[in-house]
Amino acid sequence: LPPVGSGLAPGAGIGGRLRDTVMRAFTARSVREGMRQRSGVRAEIGLPVQDPGPLRRLIATLPALEVPRPDWPAEAVVVGPLHFEPTSAVLAIPAGEGPVIVVAPSTATTGTAGLAEVALELEPGVTLPAGSRVVISRIAGDALAVPPWATVGLGRQDELLRHADLVVCGGGHGMLSKTLLAGVPMVVVPGGGDQWELANRVVRQGSGRLVRPLTVEALSVEVGEVLSSPRYREAAMRAAASIAEVADPVRVCHEALRPGR
C-alpha cells in the first residue's frame, strides 16, 4: 500500500524525535486495534485467530522515495516499483522544439480536480516557456478544447517519459515512481490520501516542486522554476540511480520459499 502520512520530514533534535515518538505511539495503537479486528474476522471464517504473518513484505518503491524506518520488521525488503501500463497505444507529441510537459491527472477519487483544464490554460510564450508542448495523459474525462500545442488522450506513460522535460501530476505513487525512474523532474499537485505525503518526499528529495492550492498562476510559476534550473533534473537522476539498491522480487520470493528457510 502507498504511504498515507502527514508529509512531515523525520524529526530532528530532541523536539523532533519526541514528536516522532508520540506519533509512532498513536500509530502503534491503531495497528493493535487493526490486528484485533483481523483476528476476529479470521475466527469468523474458520482460520486460526493468530496470524502467522508473511514470510516477506515486498516494499515496491524507489529507495529515494523512502524515509528511515527503524521499526521495519526483518522480513521487509525494498524491491523497486512494480508498474503496469494499461494500454499499448502511443500518444503523439505536438511537433516543435520546445520543452515537452507531460500532465498526468490523478485517477484517485481523492486527487485534485481540474488539473487538465488548468494545464490547458497555460500558454507557450506567456505562462509557459516559448515553444512548450503539453501532453495530457489520461484514461477518461470530459471533452476539452485542445489548442494546437497540446495533445490529450490515453497513451503509454513510459513512452511519453522518454521525451518529457517535465511531468505535472497528482502525486500518486505510480506516476511519481515512473517519472523518477525516467530521471524526469516534476511539479506535484497533490490531493488527499498518500499524495500529500509523497509530494513532500519529492520536494525534500529535490526533484520537484509542490503546488497547493491549484491555480493557473501557481502552476505557471512552479513549472517555470523547474524548467529553468538543472538541479531538479539532477535530483531526479539521483533518484533513478537508487534503483540499484533494490532486491529482485522474484528472487526474494524464491528464497523465502526455499526448503529449510
Label for each model-derived stretch:
Residues L1-V100, P105-G114, L128-G131, L144:
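Nucleotide-sugar-dependent glycosyltransferase catalytic domains
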Residues L1, L82-F84, R156, G191-D194, ...:
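Short, acidic/turn-prone active-site loops that include or flank metal/cofactor-
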Residues G153-R201:
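A donor-sugar binding/catalytic signature common to diverse glycosyltransferases
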Residues E123-R138:
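A conserved nucleotide-sugar
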